[in-house]
Curated annotation (Swiss-Prot):
Role, per record: Catalyzes the conversion of (8S)-3',8-cyclo-7,8-dihydroguanosine 5'-triphosphate to cyclic pyranopterin monophosphate (cPMP).
Assembly notes: Homohexamer; trimer of dimers.
Catalytic activity: (8S)-3',8-cyclo-7,8-dihydroguanosine 5'-triphosphate = cyclic pyranopterin phosphate + diphosphate
Assigned EC number: 4.6.1.17
Binding site for substrate: 75-77, 113-114
Keywords: Lyase, Molybdenum cofactor biosynthesis
Entry annotated with the keyword Lyase: yes
Any one Pfam family match given in the protein's UniProt record, by short name: MoaC
The gene coding this protein: moaC
Name under which the protein is recorded: Cyclic pyranopterin monophosphate synthase
Active-site residues, record numbering mapped to chain: 128
GO process annotations (BP): Mo-molybdopterin cofactor biosynthetic process
């Protein structure tokens, strides 16, 4: 069975020591969804929201969140990210927004949490900007799509 890396022999949480690991190129992609009424989504698509461009704001929020993941999640390392990309896609056929994030660096630890945080905070930002119009939006699912680099190897979700 695989061991939990953030738990020591005494069962205590600790930050993993990555100092002996080799620097490798690491990348992770994650996605999140925000379901909403067709009228709320139309307001976003048409750009008629009184707070401004919802997608631009969510994109910037996701990028900022990826860079601050280590401040939000206690055992994450501060990372020198070399790429953070957040793409937002309106999906009117499903009354939702799909968010996909991608994070990359050359370093000793992976960027899965940064990608997940970027997608999550972008979704939360959409909710925040639109809650005056609709409070029952649904955020989720949020998941890791893929990761590459590092000792544990590559991962890609099955389509």
């Amino acid at each position: 069975m695989t061991q939990l890396t953030h738990i020591n022999a005494a069962g205590e949480a600790h930050m993993v020591d990555v100092s002996a690991k080799a620097d490798t190129v690491r990348e992770a992609r994650a996605e999140a969804f925000v379901e909403m009424h067709a009228t709320t989504l139309a307001m976003i698509i048409e750009g008629s929201h009184h707070k401004g461009d919802v997608f631009a704001t969510a994109r910037i929020a996701g990028i900022q969140a990826a860079k601050k993941t280590w401040e939000l999640i206690p055992l994450c390392h501060p990372l020198l990210l070399t790429k953070v990309e957040v793409q937002l896609e309106a999906q009117p056929e499903h009354n939702r927004v799909r968010i996909e994030s991608c994070c990359r660096l050359t370093g000793k630890t992976g960027v899965e949490m940064e990608a997940l945080t970027a997608a999550s905070v972008a979704a939360l930002t959409i909710y925040d900007m639109c809650k005056a119009v609709q409070k029952d939006m649904i955020i989720g699912p949020i998941r890791l799509l893929a990761k590459s680099g590092g000792k544990s190897g590559d991962f890609k979700v099955n389509p």
